[in-house]
C-alpha cells in the first residue's frame, strides 16, 4: 500500500500525487481503451467511429508509458477499472444506435474533464522529471480527446463535470 510519503528517486522526488497520476491514467486506459475499441465497431455515426480510433490509439500509447513509468518508479498499478468505470462501460455497451453514441460521448467526456485538472496540478507541482514529461503527454492527449468528443456534437451538459469552486 502507498503510505503517501514522498520518495526520492534518481529523477527527483516522487510525491503521492505523482504516483496517483500514474495510477489514474492506468485506470483511465483500462476502460477507455476498451470502450473506444468497441465504439470503433458499434458507433452509429462515422464521426464517433473515427474519433474512437484516435482515442484508442492514444490510450494504448499512454498505457505503455504508464506501465513503463510504474516499473521504473516502483508504483503498483490497478489491473481492472473501478466500479464506476465498469458501470459506465455497461451503460454504454447496453445501448445501440444514436443512444450508444450519446452515452459513449457523455461518459468519456465526463471522465476526461474530471482528470484534466488533476493532470495540470501534478504537472505544475512535480519535481520528478519523468512524471513531468508523462504529465505533459497526458495533458496533450486528454485535451485532444475532449476536443474530439466535443466535435461529435453529442456532448450535452451531462458530459461536463461541475465547474471548480472559486
Features from the language model and the residues they span:
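His/Met- and acidic-residue-enriched segments that coordinate or traffic transition-metal cofactors
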Residues: 1-166
Amino acid at each position: 500500500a502507498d503510505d503517501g510519503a514522498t520518495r526520492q528517486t534518481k529523477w527527483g522526488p516522487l510525491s503521492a500525487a505523482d504516483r496517483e497520476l500514474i495510477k489514474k491514467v492506468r485506470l483511465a486506459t483500462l476502460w477507455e481503451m476498451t470502450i473506444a475499441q468497441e465504439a470503433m465497431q458499434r458507433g452509429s455515426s462515422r464521426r464517433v467511429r473515427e474519433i474512437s480510433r484516435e482515442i484508442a490509439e492514444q490510450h494504448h500509447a499512454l498505457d505503455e508509458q504508464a506501465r513503463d513509468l510504474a516499473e521504473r518508479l516502483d508504483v503498483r498499478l490497478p489491473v481492472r477499472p473501478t466500479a464506476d468505470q465498469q458501470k459506465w462501460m455497461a451503460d454504454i455497451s447496453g445501448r445501440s444506435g444514436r443512444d450508444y453514441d450519446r452515452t459513449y460521448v457523455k461518459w468519456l467526456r465526463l471522465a476526461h474533464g474530471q482528470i484534466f485538472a488533476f493532470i495540470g496540478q501534478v504537472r505544475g507541482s512535480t519535481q520528478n522529471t519523468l512524471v513531468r514529461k508523462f504529465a505533459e503527454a497526458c495533458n496533450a492527449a486528454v485535451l485532444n480527446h475532449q476536443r474530439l468528443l466535443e466535435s461529435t456534437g453529442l456532448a450535452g451538459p451531462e458530459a461536463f463535470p461541475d465547474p471548480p469552486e472559486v
